[in-house]
Regions:
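Conserved Rossmann-fold NAD(P)-dependent oxidoreductase catalytic core, especially the SDR/UDP-sugar
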Residues: 93-131
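NAD(P)H-binding glycine-rich loop region in Rossmannoid oxidoreductase-like domains
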Residues: 45, 49-86
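Glycine-rich NAD(P)-binding loop of the Rossmann-fold in SDR/ketoreductase-type enzymes
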Residues: 53, 82-93, 101, 112, ...
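Catalytic helix-loop patch of NAD(P)-dependent Rossmann-fold dehydrogenases
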Residues: 85, 119-155
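Conserved glycine-rich Rossmann-like NAD(P)H-binding loop of the short-chain dehydrogenase/reductase
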Residues: 27-38
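Alpha-helical substrate-binding/gating segment
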Residues: 163-169, 179-201, 208
């Protein structure tokens, strides 16, 4: 059987770099970012330089693609214009290019920051209202809505993965709850690209974490079986945590320092709020 052709945006970034060796044997990868091609392309990888804010560069990128893994865009908090150009306008540009190219599958790299203002004492699934903790988180909530729209309106099949933190091991105490090993993310992406019954799935990008704040039943129902556990790295994570000072706001909410930045809210009200289900 011929291998599927899958476009990966943001391929030069940290997550893309960790995913490439894990997906290159399974798909023909069309890697893309704003800069020039790296010098380590594998035989099943090719490179297309493109910019999410330049629609003319996206049509040639998406031509012939069976699927899109969209990691591109701004990946941390910034002022609204900086986030919105790639993550709002740019996201619609790449979705439109995918639709025009007849690409059926989209994996959208959403983020835990779409729900970052849930207290750490709450266990949440994917059927609760979004609670973004930053302009960045708002852009990820928008992205989930856009994927839902493309699935309903144009019959595309999308998976929004609310990624926790992708690394070889969890970096601190917060990451013990939200960490995902790159092997497990690659497994989840493969499910999103291949499972026959996906319309728009929202799942958490997390490994098997004892301290998880999330009910990842939606991913498990699709066959996701994470092989890594944050608790195996607890000594490392806690040693790193000890180097960080306490954060009066960030330590209460799932989004951590993203919640604390520029915070002038009411902690008690946010902790106790019960939002209506969407
Ligand atoms: C994210 O969504 C960011 O892209 C990444 O840089 C980390 O900050 C991660 O969340 C996290 O919450 O650890």
């Amino acid at each position: 059987m011929t291998q599927k052709t899958i476009v990966m945006t943001g391929a030069a970034g940290g997550v893309g770099t960790l995913l490439r060796p894990r997906l290159a044997g399974r798909y023909n990868l069309v890697l893309s970012d704003r800069g020039p091609a790296p010098d380590d392309l594998r035989p099943t990888e090719r490179w297309v330089t493109a910019d999410l804010t330049d629609p003319a560069s996206l049509a040639p990128l998406m031509a012939g693609a069976d699927g899109l893994i969209h990691l591109g865009g701004y990946s941390i908090e910034a002022d609204w214009d900086t986030v919105a150009a790639p993550n709002i306008i740019g996201l619609q540009n790449i979705m439109a290019a995918a639709r025009d190219a007849g690409t059926e599958r989209v994996i959208f790299a959403s983020s835990n920051h779409a729900v970052g203002f849930y207290p750490r004492t709450r266990r949440i699934g994917t059927d609760e209202a979004v609670r973004p903790d930053s302009f960045y988180g708002v852009s990820k909530a928008f992205g989930e809505a856009l994927c839902s729209f493309y699935a309903d309106k144009f019959a595309m099949r999308c998976m929004s993965i609310r990624i926790g933190n992708i690394a070889e091991r969890p970096a601190d105490k917060r990451r013990l709850a939200i960490w995902q090993h790159p092997d497990d993310l690659a497994q989840l992406i493969t499910i999103g690209l291949e499972h026959p019954d996906i319309h728009h799935a929202i799942v958490y990008g997390a490994s098997h974490n004892e301290r998880a704040w999330w009910d990842n039943g939606a991913a498990l129902a699709l066959g996701y079986r994470p092989e890594h556990s944050a608790e195996d790295h607890v000594d490392h994570a806690m040693a790193e945590q000890a180097k960080l000072g306490p954060n009066a706001v960030g330590d209460l909410f799932q989004g951590g320092t993203f919640c604390a930045a520029d915070f002038s809210g009411d902690v008690t009200r946010s902790l106790n709020a019960r939002l209506p289900r969407p």
